Amino acid sequence: MAHKVKASFQSLKTMPADYRFLGSPISDHLETNLITPPNGHLKNGVNGTASSVGGMDSVNEDSPYSVRSILNGERSSIGDGDSILPLPESNDRKWSDTNVYARKKVLQFWVQLPNGNWELGKIMSTSGEESVIVVTEGKVLKVKSETLVPANPDILDGVDDLMQLSYLNEPAVLYNLEYRYNQDMIYTKAGPVLVAVNPFKEVPLYGNRNIEAYRKRSNESPHVYAIADTAIREMIRDEVNQSIIISGESGAGKTETAKIAMQYLAALGGGSGIEYEILKTNPILEAFGNAKTLRNDNSSRFGKLIEIHFSETGKISGAQIQTFLLEKSRVVQCTEGERSYHIFYQLCAGASPTLREKLNLTSAKQYNYLKQSNCYSINGVDDAERFHAVKEALDIVHVSKEDQENVFAMLAAVLWLGNVSFTIIDNENHVEPEPDESLSTVAKLIGCNINELKLALSKRNMRVNNDTIVQKLTLSQAIDARDALAKSIYACLFDWLVEQINKSLAVGKRRTGRSISILDIYGFESFNKNSFEQFCINYANERLQQHFNRHLFKLEQEEYIQDGIDWTRVDFEDNQECLSLFEKKPLGLLSLLDEESTFPNGTDLTLANKLKQHLNDNSCFRGDRGKAFTVAHYAGEVTYETTGFLEKNRDLLHSDSIQLLSSCSCHLPQAFASSMLIYSEKPLVGPLHKAGGADSQRLSVATKFKGQLFQLMQRLGNTTPHFIRCIKPNNVQSAGLYEQGLVLQQLRCCGVLEVVRISRSGFPTRMFHHKFARRYGFLLLENIAAKDPLSVSVAILHQFNILPEMYQVGYTKLFFRTGQIGVLEDTRNRTLHGILRLQSYFRGHQARCRLKELKTGITILQSFVRGEKMRKEYTELLQRHRASAAIQSHVKRRIASQQYKATVDASAVIQSAIRGELVRRCAGDIGWLSSGGTKRNESDEVLVKASYLSDLQRRVLRTEAALREKEEENDILRQRVQQYDNRWSEYETKMKSMEEIWQKQMKSLQSSLSIAKKSLEVEDSARNSDASVNASDATDLDSGGSHYQMGHGRSRSVGVGLSVISRLAEEFGQRAQVFGDDRKFLMEVKSGQVEANLNPDRELRRLKQMFETWKKDYGGRLRETKLILSKLGSEETGGSAEKVKMNWWGRLRSTRY
């Protein structure tokens, strides 16, 4: 029995004899298949003290263990490893042949000592049915030959697959696992099953480097990575959902193994970021669903199925998590030395001061729910650090900060509920809650009225015949109501968290139907006291074991029979009878439990009596004294105590408590109440309900769990399973300690021996004829178009020299031994790779040729299109240039005419003003002469005329000199004009040469275009004519431009002259007015007409000096203006205009003089 295992064996020497596999030579014949290992090690007995006599050198060449035989066996089993030797196989042949062979060949055996222990020894002699054995320390024993168990040769020590063992028996398997465990090789294959031994320490078998090695298949040693890699490859190749089923007892390492498998899948299918969220669900689920037990510091107290969805390219697209049967009773009750769920201790240790004040948190030792077990910490675990990791994970799965605070508030409320105490108020033991800190804190945290909380914990409303009766609760009833509320809050919180995680990991539209499911469910449990939780857990393990048996044994052998192949039947232990004990209706354990749960007067004792009454005839059931009964599970007998069975199965939460949660202001309790009401929509009809009880639920816990298991098995049945059996090496969770008795018991429960047997004698790989022919038919050298799939398949096998004993041809399928299909797959992959390379070369050549042709055509087309486009653009630009030139010339002409007219008008005004001044002066002279000239004498007249004549002569000389200067200036200007003309002719020459070059280029482009487009010969002449027209237009454009420049310069000069003249005239008028006013003012001051504090004579001298200075400056500016006007006149009107201006200036000067 599992719960009676107390072994602490250090080696197989001290192992009891009753720990034997079903296939040991005492109860069955010996398996004799030899699989040659890749390498070997020497073995010093089971406990390292006994050594082989003579070693390998003493082995005869005729022995099946000789080097020659081993090498021959290895050569004959390439790709599979199964070399079948002619040792005892039939049921009639016992150990007589082995004894005879042993007497001749000196082999080692496992011997069963009189005290029941196993020890390694060597046969010294045989006599009849007895043999003399030499064991460790030279002890000689005489034993029966039939009790001897042959030991494997030293070369097979530590093989990575148990199928490679020559002799498959209990001590051989156990020793091989221990050998590998001591070298940190914790993974061993047992056919299709991976055996994982928990090392209880860090081992260097994980990380990105190892992931990459298994991804590239450069490392073929057994590993969880290899199982996950096989699952994802088969999912993509076969388009069938996969499942990885991890089983083992509590503490065997199932949760860590599931996390390792998820890490590999995330590494291979990562890229979208969702894989990081999937990995971060582990800290959350472990914190809220795992706890420390006596057997495991991180025991999963719930089962979970993680279904990871993949896209068509093998990338993770989402995930979904389903949980089973959370152990709610652990919230309110813990055994000595155990802990409640990790999250409670993490919250107390890692909450920030702000959060601690908000939740009114204290240390874990202050809460009744946590201190009852006197265990607050785990060695090597920092709860505060884990709490921060949980908060980080909640952020990653998109749980908001507000929701996180609400979650922590619910946890604190559960802890404070445990501290709520009651006071007895009457003689009938009725109670009411004490109004202390605990009660007020709970009301504050869940957001309810404190009075309503008091009523919910101390009273119960009952409906009987449409009447409501208020029932006061006793102390025990109140405590049960308090604990039920705490358990319900925590269970609903756990379900709510799982729901939030699933929303974050939702696949949505990315779902493709391909998935890999990882099942991590509680292992088989057997304690000194087993309750309802162990009852359900072990029932689940029975169901999983049935699935394991069905897949590896039943379906396998049924398929062999249906397809009519030759095979050897392997017996295995079927647990169908135990499953029927649980599930049979109406007299099964679950049915009777539900029936008793519906009775209001049902008790745990009446349940036990009912079970004994109806199930005593079942071979898997035994009734014990009192409330106990025993069930013979596949892993051993377990005795259950029915105490608490009915209460836990009913899982009652009174409607008053649900109403309390729905009235809370916090949204989480409201959500919890809604989920409970939905669950209670269809009440269970029974005597309790008819009697008016307010408690009702749709299904009992056991029935609901049974339904979940059936759905789980249905989902797993639609997948290709991959099994991992986790083994716990010791009960003290210590690294390096290997308790062989405990390991042996677990190996029996896992059925490892039977798995290896059926794998060695069976054909694990099978394929339909048509699929095999379609997959490998192209490898045949001959034409197979007209052949049927079976003929094609046989031809493929013959072509690749597959040995007949390595495959079987069935009615519809081909069956292969392990490794044979791998040879064909390697050949197929190499051939496909060669085909792909050849195709890539040919397609590359075709693509390059097409690209070259395409480039040539594109170049011709581009040249034509660009030429046509440039011609259109040139024509358009030419038209725009001509139009703009015409507009510019018209505008400039208009501007010049307007400026010239303004200049002429201004000149006329100036001339009229000056001439008027001259006329006025002359009129004054004439008047003076007419009035006083008669009185002068002739001599004065002569003097006046002489002076006037001399003045005229001087003016003539000055005019001639100025004329000469102007002629010299004109000569200089003519020279400059000549230089400008020369430069302009050079520019014209250059422009003409550039035009000729451009015309030549145009002609060359036109000739190239005519060669490329021979069909456009008619358009060539038009293009040539266009070119000539364009050239003439360019010439016109140049001439027009020069004309525009000259006209523009001339008009600009005229404008400057007019502005200067207008300024001079304006200044003359202003200065004359100013000087006249000043002179008149000073004369009035001097004559006394005006009084002023100044010296008139000094001011007159000063004014005269200022006048002379201005006159000198003004004269200079007049001369400059003259020169400018003279130049303009010479350019516009020639010599006549110049003479007119000279005469005009002469008159002006004579007038001034």
UniProtKB/Swiss-Prot annotation:
The keyword Repeat applies. Residues 1024-1033 have a biased composition (Polar residues). InterPro entries: IQ_motif_EF-hand-BS, Kinesin_motor_dom_sf, Myosin_head_motor_dom-like, Myosin_N, MYSc_Myo8, P-loop_NTPase. Residues 948-996 form a coiled coil. Residues 157-829 form the Myosin motor domain. GO terms for molecular function: actin binding; ATP binding; calmodulin binding; cytoskeletal motor activity. Residues 1020-1050 are annotated as: Disordered. Residues 581-615, 709-731 are annotated as: Actin-binding. Myosin heavy chain that is required for the cell cycle-regulated transport of various organelles and proteins for their segregation. Functions by binding with its tail domain to receptor proteins on organelles and exerting force with its N-terminal motor domain against actin filaments, thereby transporting its cargo along polarized actin cables. IQ domain mediates interaction with calmodulin. This is Myosin-3. It comes from Arabidopsis thaliana.
